[in-house]
């Protein structure tokens, strides 16, 4: 609870004053009154609220009796020498009035509007101070020029916990570089590892720690009471709980598909309009989502920021990295409700579901053949064109599919990533391992039969 804030005015042509700020009172006292006069006038301005022993009593007026423009409670001469502008610089902490979320909730609408008006004028004058510093070449004494000082003030406002107090204040301050980013929703803080962008530096720093595996808030301690899923923050739980409500608040006006979040429906509507506002600077390919464009750019740079700690394999996408980690742990969290088959990634489960439904939405325009996967259709098209864009660097053999090239490269490297857990035999392809594992199942179930497992393809051959 703020018990008082006195903003000193500036007068005279020399020096800039450091505003005097009253100390914060006990936060437990309820705010009852909030008054102000416009700050930075010829008289001292007072922003006060009632507290213990201060009900309805404002601070005493200041007396501008010194030629340097300083104000004093008592009409006595200024005994201090004229201070340099560097010593009397205006500090953001000196003029900022911070309410806790509980205190802010106690204010009525008129008090909040009054507070915003005071802070808006305060910020304008702080920006003016920064401009004056620059005009007087005082920024030579600082590491940053006056322009950056003004931006620093606004940045401090943006990073405040009480966003509800400062958000509207900052957005209405003119001639500030950060103002454009705030009002348009642009995010100036970009992660150099994955390209994800954030509004605040604090969120960016927290995100960078996630790449290193460090958890600044410890383990996930906030649990969803309905499904038992854990989250690292309360907002994460609240956002997740919306999906349990079963009542999506947003609906596509074109197809009627429902969504829980506004940004989701906006992103979905681009599939109808064909809008792709995000373009790759190198090849010009366009995307509907900014994140997809950033991920695509890694195909040009070859960047693979995600590395597996078990085998050292690197990945370009976080989803591919997480799916790969499950090959080491054996985790298959996505289960089919019709046949109980489990998968390590949701995409595989979705494709598997088309087997039961028989749905094949992707059709070749040349021959009419339909596919359940878009990637399968793309691979099929190469059979019509004869194009083989994927070429092996070691033997110059070309392939129509990228996956076929990767399988071929294992011949040169000798890599056999698919290993049988029972006998240790390894294979270059997962399908070969699956065939081999069936031989163990047949041996276990038919040990009394005349069965001879053949090494050819890992399949068993019955002897008549």
From Swiss-Prot:
Pfam families: KRAB (PF01352), zf-C2H2 (PF00096). Keywords: DNA-binding, Metal-binding, Nucleus, Repeat, Transcription, Transcription regulation, Zinc, Zinc-finger. Residues 90-176 form the KRAB domain. GO terms for biological process: regulation of transcription by RNA polymerase II. Coiled coil: none annotated. May be involved in transcriptional regulation. This is Zinc finger protein 669. The gene is ZNF669.
């Amino acid at each position: 609870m703020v018990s008082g804030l006195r903003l000193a005015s500036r007068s005279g042509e020399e020096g800039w004053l450091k505003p005097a700020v009253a100390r914060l009172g006990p936060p437990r006292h309820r705010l009852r009154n909030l008054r102000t006069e416009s700050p930075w006038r010829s008289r001292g301005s007072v922003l006060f609220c009632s507290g213990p022993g201060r009900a309805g009593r404002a601070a005493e007026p200041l007396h501008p009796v010194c030629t340097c423009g300083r104000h004093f409670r008592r009409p006595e001469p200024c005994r201090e020498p004229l201070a340099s502008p560097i010593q009397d610089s205006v500090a953001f902490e000196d003029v900022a009035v911070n309410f806790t979320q509980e205190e802010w909730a106690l204010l009525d609408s008129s008090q909040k509007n009054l507070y915003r008006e005071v802070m808006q004028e305060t910020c304008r004058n702080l920006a003016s101070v920064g401009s004056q510093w620059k005009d007087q070449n005082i920024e030579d004494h600082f590491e940053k020029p006056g322009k950056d000082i003004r931006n620093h003030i606004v940045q401090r406002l943006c990073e405040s916990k009480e966003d509800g107090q400062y958000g509207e204040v900052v957005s209405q301050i003119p001639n500030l570089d950060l103002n454009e980013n705030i009002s348009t929703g642009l995010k100036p803080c970009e992660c150099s590892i994955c390209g994800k962008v954030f509004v605040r530096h604090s969120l960016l720093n927290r995100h960078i720690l996630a790449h290193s595996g460090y958890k600044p808030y410890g383990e996930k301690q906030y649990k969803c009471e309905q499904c038992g899923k854990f989250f690292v923050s309360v907002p994460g739980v609240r956002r997740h709980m919306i999906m349990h409500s079963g009542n999506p608040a947003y609906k596509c006006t074109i197809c009627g598909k429902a969504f829980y979040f506004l940004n989701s429906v906006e992103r979905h509507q681009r599939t109808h309009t064909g809008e792709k506002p995000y373009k790759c600077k190198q090849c010009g390919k366009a995307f509907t989502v900014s994140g997809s464009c950033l991920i695509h750019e890694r195909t040009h740079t070859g960047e693979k920021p995600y590395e597996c700690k078990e085998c050292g394999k690197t990945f370009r996408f976080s989803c591919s990295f997480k799916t790969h980690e499950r090959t080491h742990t054996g985790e298959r969290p996505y289960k089919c409700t019709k046949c109980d088959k489990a998968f390590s990634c949701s995409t595989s489960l979705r494709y598997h579901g088309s087997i039961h439904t028989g749905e094949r939405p992707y059709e070749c325009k040349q021959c009419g053949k339909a596919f359940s996967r878009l990637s399968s259709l793309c691979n099929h098209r190469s059979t019509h064109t004869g194009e083989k864009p994927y070429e092996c660097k070691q033997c110059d053999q070309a392939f129509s599919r990228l996956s076929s090239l990767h399988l071929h490269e294992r011949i040169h490297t000798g890599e056999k990533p698919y290993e049988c857990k029972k006998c240790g035999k390894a294979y270059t392809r997962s399908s070969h391992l699956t065939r081999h594992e069936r031989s163990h199942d047949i041996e276990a179930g038919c040990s009394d039969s005349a069965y001879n497992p053949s090494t050819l393809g890992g399949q068993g051959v019955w002897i008549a």
